[in-house]
Amino acid sequence: MSTAGLRIAVAANTSWYLYNFRRNLMRALSDDGHHVVAVGGDGAFGQRLTEQGFANREVTFSGAGTRPWRELATVLELRRVLRDERIDLVLSYTPKGNVYAALAGRGLPTAQVMNVSGLGRAFTSLGVASRLVHLLYRQTVARAAWVFFQNEDDRRLFIDRGYVQVGRTSRLPGSGVDLDAFAPTPLPSRQAGSGVFLMVARLLWDKGVREYVEAARALRVRWPQARFQVLGPLDASARSGVPRATLEAWVADGLVEYLGETDNIRPFLQAADCVVLPSYYREGVPRSLLEAAATMRPVITTDAVGCRDTVDPGISGLLCRPRDAKDLAEKMAQVLMMTPEQRAAMGGAGRQKMEQEFDERSVIDAYRLRVALLKRAP
């Protein structure tokens, strides 16, 4: 590759993802002398990236869409961007971002570093769509110069199935967490028996929304003063999306408070006593749990791929069984019965874990090293 700075495209299916999860990496690469181009959809966040000094090219990804002609058009659109911008290296994220960048770059002098940030429902379910996802990964991952994984389960799965050679892979601590932006803050002054639980997620059944609501229903009988909040967007385009009418019924019944969606999660974390994500979605490493722990909030999540990596059980948080509302309710009850000092100790352990294992700077350093090695390659 060139001895000068590289022309690097950072690609995902939404500019929202790039702005919220990869902005600091893009800034670091730019500071290293590389020309960084953001490639994603949804123009509002693309404009924010432009305002921060990054080149931005919008490509229309279709979310959960699977119409062949629409998907082919996206690949061709992405290929034009790679060619017109004379891209040396693509850093790709999200399933469609990974696969489509690989297809778009065929025949071009463009290397690719993939980031497998969880496999989601399409990879683990049965049916034609799942088989297609497996086929596309099999055909594209092997061509990548390097593949980062966010958890060891996914890394071993790809290696064992022969999708990628072990020597071209490594594991990252998720997307990491900005420890300065998510600084430790004291828990609210609430006594044992009361508390605010917060679930942060897209409202998909696979994220454990049903289990969370059923746990709230059970807990309100004994602890009527406890509050159960949900923060995140509805996703009508997803097969497993929670219908708006169902959510409105839960709110009307007083089971949960719906907080909508936000670009700034920090004030909601600061108002919560515990953050809950009972997901069985096949996560990478959920960013919401990292941010919660960084702000010293105890965490409850599932003993499932990706989620379990964020918690030291009984120390920084609690693990429950996937798809088990009763077990989730029992873990939430444990938090309700804790003294303020016990909750603070658990939250403090979570912060320490983030500092030791999930600092975003370690993720950025891993990318910087990989880019430097690829730059020196013939």
Regions found by a protein language model. Name each.
Residues P186-K207, V213-R217, Q229:
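Conserved donor-binding/catalytic core segment of Leloir-type glycosyltransferases
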Residues G232, G241-T262:
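Nucleotide-activated donor-binding/catalytic signature segment of Leloir-type glycosyltransferases, i.e.
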Residues D312-G314, L318-A325, Q334-P340:
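Conserved acidic donor-binding segment of nucleotide-sugar-dependent glycosyltransferases
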Residues R57-E58, R138-T185:
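Donor nucleotide-sugar binding/catalytic pocket of nucleotide-sugar-dependent glycosyltransferases
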Residues P298-T301, V311:
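Short hydrophobic beta-strand element within catalytic cores of glycosyltransferases
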Residues G40-A44, V200, R227-V242:
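Glycosyltransferase donor-sugar binding loop
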Residues Q334, E341-E357, V363-L369:
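A short, well-ordered alpha-helix in the C-terminal region of glycosyltransferases
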